[in-house]
């Protein structure tokens, strides 16, 4: 069946329908990872977005459910150059085609993903529609695309009730703004007892449980939409509890302490982004998925925090260390999945802050 990807600037890509045949409007983004497509599809940070995979062949190792980063896929749509319909992998239990159909997610294959990526890089991230309607009307569709916003998606992807992962080590409160599964796993495998809280949980409730440390997770959308959450994070900042924040959590901590964020032209999404540790000078290859960035200069001028990591490619901020506080935040994903685990030592640094076992690299 024919399918069409229509961008808000009027570009139309013709391809073949994969997955569901329903029509969808979403933000169109691209990911440069060669593998890890299941982890991408099930990453809650992609809620409200259709993802274009830049690698030309996707699906050749099938679907392995134990690799999911959450209970279900959160992408709005999936865009590939070529979809492998016959995977070869002893772990595979499903195909992308059936996986997308099962979860009612539309997609398109057979388009020039390189051309699409170049458009998004040159013009910036934009909204688009995936449709199988051959009689589409651009004059009717384009105003709808320009009016689309993702809204407050954190409340959509967060857990609905508190959950506890047992452990004999430090007690960690994980605020779930759309947390990838491997964040909790990375803490739990280090012995931590991890309590996962819904995103709108009041700070008083979290602090009443007397955690040894607080983790602010990744998540989707514009951080400035999370006004209620920002107020609660401000209260957590004022406590003496060690805090480690990742991705959206990094942005929310900056906003909670008087900093600012802004939308990037096309964001960082992939498993090959080099970041530099400004304290040691070492460079790590990181997994990233974000479309917003923290204004580090503003926080530094106020004496609230100083930059800890920068992106080697474009110089944007990748982490902050907060003055006089046991708080550090990073924009990238030390838990990886998919991607390199170069920076997993940051979980050990967090353990050390909480007084737990020090497994940090020397």
What positions do the PLM features span?
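RNA-binding accessory domains that recognize and position tRNA/RNA substrates
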Residues: 1-204, 208-209, 223, 337, ...
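Proline-centered loop/turn at the N-terminus of a beta-strand
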Residues: 106, 171, 242-244, 260, ...
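Beta-strand-turn-beta hairpins that frame and shape the catalytic cleft
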Residues: 167-172, 280-283, 322-327
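Cysteine-nucleophile active-site neighborhood
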Residues: 213, 218-285, 296, 339-355
